[in-house]
UniProtKB/Swiss-Prot annotation:
Residues 11-30 are annotated as: Disordered. It is a multi-pass membrane protein. Belongs to the cytomegalovirus US12 family. It comes from Human cytomegalovirus (strain AD169) (HHV-5). It comes from the Viruses. Keywords: Membrane, Transmembrane, Transmembrane helix. The gene is US12. Its main location: membrane. This is Uncharacterized protein HVLF6. One of its GO terms (cellular component) is membrane.
Length: 281
């Protein structure tokens, strides 16, 4: 006897579909919070301090090499006697350090590491450019320029440290820096000088003021260095080149007002004679 089986609720010959697998609900993402212990914070502070000591030690080495070479050039009895060459040589000597400063800033923006060979090339070229100042002017002028530029660099570094370590005085320092340039312009405007003398000194003061702001920014970059960055030798050498070039350009700009009694009359007379020769030929 044949037994016939019936499928209840489904037609014959139809395969039963399996329900789609249901995955269990995924747990919420775990937020990883990095907890910096006191020992790690102390270790990073010590590492940052040692990095800054090496940084400023490199800058002091570069500056000392430049000063020593300039003193050797000052001891040479020969001096540049041609008025036009003596008056314009410091200006041409400023162009090379400015170009090197722009290249160092380009390296900083691109995060390119500095090398020891690049530091030596920077120091050699800049030292040659600065040492020519010792062949153009008296020793007293060069010494005064070094002292005044060093005081300005130390003052800018001190302001940067105050802005970094004392948040309450930051607004006062910014206000002081904002009002300083108009006060200097007003001081130049009330002097009984020739118009070209006022224009040249106003431009020089503006460049020195802008360089002070740049030096403060570079110092703040050093002080606010992120702990996540590795303190490599390449970053140290690149930053040292920036600070060194700031100090050199500050010295070259300070030379202009200190040598004003020397080159203002001669240079103005030379320009007047050249203009008269060109327009009344």
């Amino acid at each position: 006897m044949v037994q016939i089986q019936f499928h209840q609720g489904e037609p014959l010959g139809h395969k039963k579909e399996k329900p789609p697998p249901v995955s269990p609900p995924s747990p919420p993402p775990i937020r990883r919070v990095t907890v910096i212990t006191k020992d790690e914070d102390t270790l990073r502070s010590v590492q940052h301090f040692l990095w800054m000591v090496r940084l400023y030690g490199t800058v002091v080495f570069q500056t000392s090499a430049t000063i020593a070479t300039t003193i050797l050039f000052m001891l040479i009895p020969w001096r540049v006697t041609a008025p036009y060459l003596r008056d314009t040589l410091p200006f041409w000597s400023t162009l090379l350090p400015c170009a090197l400063r722009c290249h160092a800033y380009w390296l900083e923006r691109r995060r390119r590491p500095g090398t020891l060979m690049l530091v030596m090339v920077y120091t050699t070229l800049t030292t040659i450019s600065v040492s020519t100042i010792g062949l153009c002017f008296d020793r007293t002028v060069v010494i005064q320029a070094y002292v005044l530029s060093s005081m300005l660099c130390v003052w800018c570094t001190g302001l940067a440290w105050l802005m970094a370590w004392n948040m309450q005085r930051r607004l006062a320092i910014l206000c002081l820096l904002s009002f300083m340039l108009p006060i200097l312009w007003l001081f130049i405007a009330v002097q009984s000088w020739e118009p070209y003398q006022r224009i040249i000194l106003a431009l020089t003061v503006s460049f020195i003021y802008g360089l002070k702001i740049v030096l403060i920014r570079d110092t703040l970059t050093v002080l606010y260095r992120s702990p996540s960055n590795c303190y490599t030798d390449g970053d140290l050498l690149r930053t040292a080149m920036l600070l060194y070039m700031d100090q050199v350009i500050m010295f070259l700009l300070v030379v202009v007002p200190l040598t004003a009694p020397i080159w203002y009359p001669n240079y103005a007379g030379a320009l007047g004679r050249t203009a008269h020769w060109l327009f009344h030929k």
